[in-house]
Amino acid sequence: FPWLLELGDWVRQSTTKLKTRLSHESIIENGDYTAVSPEDVGKEIAVSLFRQMLRLRRLEEALVAEYHPADEMRCPIHFCIGQEAVPAALSLLLKSEDYLFSHHRTHGYYFAKGAPLKELFAEIYGRATGANGGLAGSQDISHTESRFFGGAILAGAVCIAAGAAFGLQHQKTKGISVAGFGEGATDEGAFWEAINHAGAKRLPILFVVENNRYATFSDQLKRQQTDNIAQR
């Protein structure tokens, strides 16, 4: 397809541009990400999603490069390198009224909800201008105006998202609640309690599992009967 060749040219140009000055400032200078809509087709969706994935990867690589040399970041960081596709897809599907609750690798989900990058970097550097005044850091960052919430680990986002979905249903307001978690979270009892309650009450909730097959060093098939979470 001709548009694939155009996409390749765009990737080469963008990568060359970003390599000239890889820092969090260079990421911000590229401007805010503008999501496409489900009505867009073919080339538009492919280019937009790839742009989102590439920019998120470069964002993370910039943080890796700055993390230890700068020694100014006041928090531990869990990177989402290699897991850019799911946030990119969510950026296409989610609407402003939807809630998004993240696992501990928050940057991609923060990005997917369109929250401001300046406030993300300021938060990581412990600045008062950060999304949470520099008090939350990378893992626990939230941006209430964008309806994005971090601060959950080990299936915690699942229960919180279920509560938000119940609130939406009770108030009869638009939007859905989205819970992001890894396949390791499905080993937790809280996960099964949340999905059981969501099913029983028909809550407006979407469960998004990022399956990288490992919970720290434990292979999934040594912990679970199948690697198909939906089937399980």
Q: Which residues does each predicted region cover?
A:
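Cofactor-binding active-site loop characterized by glycine-rich and histidine/acidic residues
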Residues: 61, 70-201, 219-226, 230
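N-terminal amphipathic, basic-rich helices that act as targeting or association modules
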Residues: 11-105
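A glycine-rich helix N-cap at a beta->alpha junction
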Residues: 201-208
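Short, ordered loop/turn segments at secondary-structure junctions
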Residues: 105, 210-213
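Short beta-alpha connecting loops at secondary-structure transitions
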Residues: 213-219
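Active-site flanking residues adjacent to catalytic metal/cofactor-binding acidic residues
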Residues: 182, 209-210
